[in-house]
UniProtKB/Swiss-Prot annotation:
This is Large ribosomal subunit protein bL19. The keyword Ribonucleoprotein applies. The gene is rplS. It comes from the Bacteria. Pfam families: Ribosomal_L19. Belongs to the bacterial ribosomal protein bL19 family. The keyword S-adenosyl-L-methionine does not apply. GO terms for biological process: translation. GO terms for cellular component: cytosolic large ribosomal subunit. This protein is located at the 30S-50S ribosomal subunit interface and may play a role in the structure and function of the aminoacyl-tRNA binding site.
């Protein structure tokens, strides 16, 4: 039974996404349907968590919009996620950056990873 599920999940996990992780600043192009037309909306922010669970993989992106922190969870292999572009690599020592929720301003900055 689980072999069949694995094969079906593998068929649906065909989307090519760049390697990214917590601390990286990404731009996610999301398909938004407004009435009869569909357009792409860019959502730029810092990845604070990534969950690798096969087809159920997801990641959380946090940004500050008009002084208010906004977090959005994206399903990695969702048809609504058009593309993910890595703007800058962050150098962090944690897998989950939930502590950024309590920080604001300069304290919430993340060092850039040196190549």
């Amino acid at each position: 039974m689980s072999d069949i599920i694995k094969r079906i999940e593998a068929e649906q996990m065909t989307k090519e996404l760049p390697e990214f992780g917590p601390g990286d600043t990404v731009v996610v192009q999301v398909k938004v349907k407004e009435g009869s037309n569909e357009r792409l909306q860019a959502y730029e922010g810092v990845v604070i968590a990534k969950k690798n669970r096969g087809l159920n993989s997801s990641f959380i992106v946090r940004k500050i919009s008009h002084g208010v922190g906004v977090e959005r969870t994206f399903q990695t292999y969702s048809p609504l996620v058009d593309s993910v572009e890595v703007k800058r690599r962050g150098d962090v020592r944690r897998a989950k950056l939930y502590y950024l929720r309590d920080l604001s301003g300069k304290a919430a900055r993340i060092k850039e990873k040196v190549k």
